[in-house]
Amino acid sequence: MRVASIIINRPAKQLHKPLSYLLPEKFGDVKAGTRVLVPLGGSREEGILIGYEELLEKPTFTLRSIIDILDSDPWFTREMMDTAQKISRYFLCSFGDALRLFTVHKTLKSYDAPKEEWLVVTPEFKIDQLSPKKRKQRELANYLIEVGGAPKSLLRAKGYSYMVIKQVGEEHGIHIEERFKDTKTSFTELLSGEETIPLTEAQQIVYEPIKQMMDLESYNTFLLHGVTGSGKTQIYLKAAARCIGKGKTAIILVPEIILTDQIVRRFVSTFGDEVVVFHSKLTISERNNNWERIRRKDSHIIIGARSAVFAPAEDIGLIVLDEEHDTSYKQEDMIRYNAKNVALWRGMAHDCPVILGSATPAITSYYKALQGQYKLLELPTRIFDQPMPNVQIVDMKEEMIRGNYSVFSDAMTHLIERTLADGNQMIILLNRRGYSTFVMCRDCGETIMCPHCEVAMVYHQAGEELRCHYCEHHEPIPSVCPKCQSKRIKFFGSGTQKVEEELRRHFKGARIARLDQDVTKHKDMGEEILQDFGKHKYDILLGTQMVSKGHDFKDVTAVGILTADSVLNIPVYSASERAFDLLTQTSGRAGRGDKVGSVVIQTYNPLNYAIIKSKAHDYLGFYNEEIVNRKDLGYPPFREMIYMVIRHAKEEMAESISQKIVDDLETNFKSPSIDVNGPYEAGIKKIRDMYRLSIMIRGENLDAVKDYIYNSWIFTQEGLLIDVDPI
């Protein structure tokens, strides 16, 4: 008699543990990771077979039988299931939810391996069909004439927009064909191709231990600390070439979708069709296609945001996290996993090196490197000894004393004017989208709030509306105060839309592009703006933090940071670290070409150590001060943290449930090394009509607390969000 462990494929907390079913002999040997059909209550459900065992004696309880086997081949490898189990137990989510991270769809839907659409040129096509004004279309057509044809996925990776590809594909003499991908790459050729990727002497020293671990097929975590512009990407390219030369797969992670375009261009120019891209802006068809290319081992370099760490590669030889400090690697909704943890678990399972690269490593990562848990590699200077940019800190209190109430200090204005006069480019950071940050009545002081969330509505000039950035509720701008009927309504604060307007008014003739979430929600818009900025079609790039990292524009000689305090003042233990990262990373965009860069940072806290150290590009100085504060206050890396939020439509029920959880935990964990704090109001009391209370648990080791929560009623409590290792 065979008894199988089955995870039900339904996102229900009550089904977070495997259920037992009989595995009839008629199904023969069924491999772990295969989908099955099982009875559950009065219905039939899809499940995943985790494994089975032979029982010599009949169990004393009744078991129902598996109805059918749904796949001839497993959906999940043993490594994927083991990693999902680690995610489930560490981040406190259901096993089924963790497994679904390894799939394209939220549900495990079977599909045939799709074909790729190719654009193919025939002799009937003439380049003169295309107007000279259609520059991108002609550029693409000339490329197709040169190579004969190419898959749409490759053209997208090369930077051609969906619309350009569509228009060229509709031209007479260019056909769209569906083809199965036929990969004939020679791994020997790729290995020899590694020699064509040059490294400086400093880069070669850093690369050698990584190469050694790949040759030994041995796991190790390398923390690559290299200042901005030191050439970390070149090391990633070199390591990836060696990895795929050995017939293995490399996973390259970047924190933001917007950053995939530049790094994809670097990799595609080196490896061509070996590169496959993953991020959330891809269509389901594109994701299916890319997923299958990996499963069929047609592509061996995977580039993408955090979800790319779950790519179904069975022969991983290298994992890279670029900008490893970035908070975007932590998913903040649904399953709150950190891609860094997953990368380390997968690297360990595949016996391959993991590279964590950053100019501003996470405090916890640098601490682990100094403790010997990671191997520290350093690139302390820019490539070809380019100087770091000159940074000026401006005290905005002094500006106000002098009568300057503008969003631009005198120093910022002069920097913009000089940059434009010299024909160079500038990046300006304002980490706040929208037009005005809140709207208030000047008679009664009423701030217009979201009716579903206890947050102020933000004015967006596009559409002339107020919008909530938490639930996306939007409404027209009121003509009178909803409380006192006064018409004296004023817009306060400055978002990216308002600053863009100010720039256009003060610097007439300047070509300005804005990059924020309101822009990038439109497919391809973000990457097109960055491509055009790289071609110097714009003089100024204004945006939120997505302009701060990973970009390499040779004509950018100036960077302006309008409000350094917006990050310093967020109510999290890592606020100083986030501020130092943002200021240093943004400053590092300046002077990456032949010209020295200049940076102006505006702040109301010029003596804050994060700002002072970022001016000097002094990571070690910042680390030494921050780590002392962390130890004194009991924050990571010295203590672990679990943050809980209890949500309920009724405020009194949220209070009751949260107090019950606190009482339970305090009863079971009376150790002085574990603190249970709360319940108290969450940072935002109400979101989407749900009241929110929070609980914080801290301790040197919280493994026992996690195990208890996972196996208790707390785990299945409706409306409970659990955030392990909040950042």
What are these regions (language model features)?
Residues 1, 428, 484, 667-668, ...:
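Polar low-complexity intrinsically disordered regions
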Residues 1-358, 370-386, 671, 684, ...:
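Accessory, non-ATPase domains that flank or precede helicase/AAA+ motor cores in DNA-metabolism machines
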Residues 3, 31-32, 653-666:
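A short, contiguous, amphipathic alpha-helix enriched in charged residues
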Residues 6-8, 418, 677:
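Short, charged low-complexity linear motifs
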Residues 51-53, 103, 178-180, 430-432, ...:
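A general secondary-structure junction signal
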Residues 119-121, 176, 391, 457, ...:
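Generic structural motif
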Residues 194-200, 204, 217-655, 663, ...:
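Inter-lobe coupling/hinge segments of SF2-like helicase ATPases
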Residues 663, 667-687:
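A carboxyl-terminal module marker
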